[in-house]
C-alpha cells in the first residue's frame, strides 16, 4: 500500500480525556502505511453544530481547518465523532449554501475563498475505504480472540445521512466490521445507533437521562 498523508484534526477531547485514542490512532496509521499530519494551531470546533442560519462565527474554526487541508492538497481526517459531525456539516454548508460561504469567507479574508473542496473522512472510513479491513486483519499483531464487543454509533456519525454519508443510518456495520478485523466478535443490540441525548443534556436533563438509560439496558439481539 502506498504511503499517504492526511491532514488531521484531533480536537479537544483527544488532547485531554482521550489522549490514548490519539496516540493509538497515530501508531496504527504508521503501521498501516499512512500518516496523520496534525493541522497547525487548530481551534475547538465548538463540539455542537450550530443550527441557526445566522451562526457564522462558530463555524470559522472548522473552515480554517478545512482550508489548511485544502492548501496542502490533503483529505482531512477526524476521530472524535462530535468533531467529525461539526466539520463535515460545516464543509457541506461551505459547498452548498451560498450565504454561509460568502459570509464565512468575508470573515476569514483568505487569499483564495474556500468552497468546500476538502474531503472529510472519519478514521474508520480511512481503514474501511482506503486501507481495507482485509489488510488491517493481516496487520493485527495481537488479535482480540474470544472478546465480545458491542459498538455504540450514536447519531453524530450517521445523521443526517445524506451529508454524513458514513454508513447506513438505520443499520450501520462499519464498526462491527472493524471489530471482526481485529479478531473480536461484534455484539448487536438495540439502540446502538440512537441518540444519547447529548445535544439536549443541559436544557432537558431528565429527557437526556431517559434516552441514555434505554441504551444502557438494551439487550443483545
Name the predicted role of every residue range:
Residues 2-7:
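Extreme N-terminal starter segment of soluble prokaryotic enzymes
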Residues 14-21:
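Short N-terminal binding/cap micro-motifs at the start of the first secondary-structure element
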Residues 22-36, 169-180:
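Short catalytic helix/loop segments, enriched in acidic residues and glycine
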Residues 35-55, 156, 181-207:
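Short connector loops at secondary-structure junctions
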Residues 53-74, 207-212:
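Short, structured active-site "lid" loops
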Residues 93-117:
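Short mixed-charge
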Residues 142-177:
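Hydrophobic, aromatic-enriched interface-forming segments
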Residues 215-221:
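Residue-level detector of conserved catalytic or cofactor/ligand-binding positions
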